[in-house]
């Protein structure tokens, strides 16, 4: 396996979270982040052809839509066009705000960014510099191991993640 990694995340808030967790000291594997909804859209063939065999592909996706056909098709296409990959699933069961509240010492996500509303929180969170975001998460005692530990809805059982640090959670194809 090579040491390349690509993260496919649903939106800018997930992009910010992943980027912050990759800051030193790294809590996630370093790699490139692409904003792309793998549950609702098919990864373009041109992108897949640029992924080298042995790359770790991390799929961060929401589970609020019970339709998983595009996710399954993306997995088929990744294995067809990219050769041997390590694919890691990080399904998000709660919305980002709830997830951060569950994993930090705050009662509301707005406390993290001192925002006046949930909408402002998302805007403020996404606009933060990556290092500032990481510092804010550390200051509020983010428990990294709890981020992706919530049980997924039934439609997503195939992609259940017990722990991001559990060596058995990666699916190799």
Residue ranges and their predicted role:
Residues 2, 15-30, 45-58, 65-173:
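C-terminal accessory helical subdomains adjacent to catalytic cores in phosphodiester-
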Residues 6-10:
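Short hydrophobic beta-strand that contains or immediately precedes a catalytic carboxylate
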Residues 11, 63:
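Residues immediately flanking
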Residues 34-35, 39, 59:
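Conserved helicase/translocase motor-coupling segment
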Residues 41-43:
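N-terminal polybasic phosphate/anion-binding patch
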């Amino acid at each position: 396996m090579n040491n390349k990694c690509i993260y496919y995340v649903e939106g800018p808030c997930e992009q910010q979270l992943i980027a912050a967790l990759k800051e030193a000291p790294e809590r996630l594997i370093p790699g490139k982040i692409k904003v792309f909804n793998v549950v609702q859209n098919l990864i373009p063939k041109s992108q897949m052809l640029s992924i080298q065999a042995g790359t770790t592909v991390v799929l961060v996706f929401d589970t609020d839509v019970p339709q998983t056909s595009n996710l399954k098709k993306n997995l088929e296409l990744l294995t067809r066009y990219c050769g041997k990959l390590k694919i890691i699933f990080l399904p998000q069961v709660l919305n980002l705000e709830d997830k951060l509240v569950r994993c930090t010492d705050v009662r509301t996500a707005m406390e993290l960014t001192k925002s006046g509303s949930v909408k402002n929180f998302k805007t403020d969170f996404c606009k933060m510099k990556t290092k500032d975001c990481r510092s804010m998460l550390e200051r509020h005692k983010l428990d990294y191991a709890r981020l992706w530990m919530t049980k997924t809805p039934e439609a997503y059982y195939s992609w259940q993640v017990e722990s991001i640090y559990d060596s058995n959670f990666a699916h190799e194809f």
